[in-house]
Amino acid sequence: MIKRSAVVLMAVILTGCGNKTLEEVGNAPAMSPVGSGLRYNQAPQLASYPKQTKAVSNGYSLWNDSQAALFKDSRAINVGDLLTVNISIADKAKFKNDTSRSRKNSTSLTWSTVINLFGITPPDSSGDMSTDSNSSSDGKGSVDRSETLTLMVAAVVTSILENGNLLISGSQEVRVNHEVRILNVAGIVRPQDVDAKNTISYEKIAEARISYGGKGRLTEVQQPPVGQQVVDMFSPF
């Protein structure tokens, strides 16, 4: 009987949890796909990298056509081209809110009824009624945070939108001892915002998705155990 009750309880927990919630247990929150904030009927699809065309050799020339880019713009404009993303975030926010509300209400009612019917006067019927109500609330909240992140990462042009804007995506992993630091960047850029050094600053990236985290021994220790996360998910306190 106890075993059956435990099975039923576990089934109820799993049903109420849902597949999406279970996938998030033990993992960092997933970032939304690039382009999901745009008003498109469908999200922009990533295109496959184009094949590089064969260089045509000319027997009467000392130079190869593949290197004929003396006056060519070296900025990323095609699918598969690379560009450098400069990330320099120094955000600081400080908020302080105080709210106070007070309300007072008072109601008084007095009545007196005397009826003379066929010469008969009943006893006097009169009364008083009053109500008083008071309510008040006070609330305080404050936020004080600062974040600094300075990195550079190479990204690849993965797609070109209909209006000519570029969809880029880049990733970088660095392993130090048993900890892997992961940097991901993705977003939509305008070709004219890419400077002559083929570099673009992060604040010029629309729908920017910048993630800097890691995985390894230190990250595992900093996260609460999976069982505790499941319990916290259903705990009402």
Swiss-Prot record:
Residues 124-140 have a biased composition (Low complexity). A lipid is attached at C17 (N-palmitoyl cysteine). GO terms for cellular component: bacterial-type flagellum basal body, distal rod, L ring; cell outer membrane. Residues 1-16 form the signal peptide. GO terms for biological process: bacterial-type flagellum-dependent cell motility. One of its GO terms (molecular function) is cytoskeletal motor activity. It holds the Pfam family FlgH. Residues 122-143 are annotated as: Disordered. PANTHER family: FLAGELLAR L-RING PROTEIN (PTHR34933:SF1). The basal body constitutes a major portion of the flagellar organelle and consists of four rings (L,P,S, and M) mounted on a central rod. NCBIfam families: PRK00249.1-5 (NF001305). This is Flagellar L-ring protein. It comes from Allorhizobium ampelinum (strain ATCC BAA-846 / DSM 112012 / S4) (Agrobacterium vitis (strain S4)).
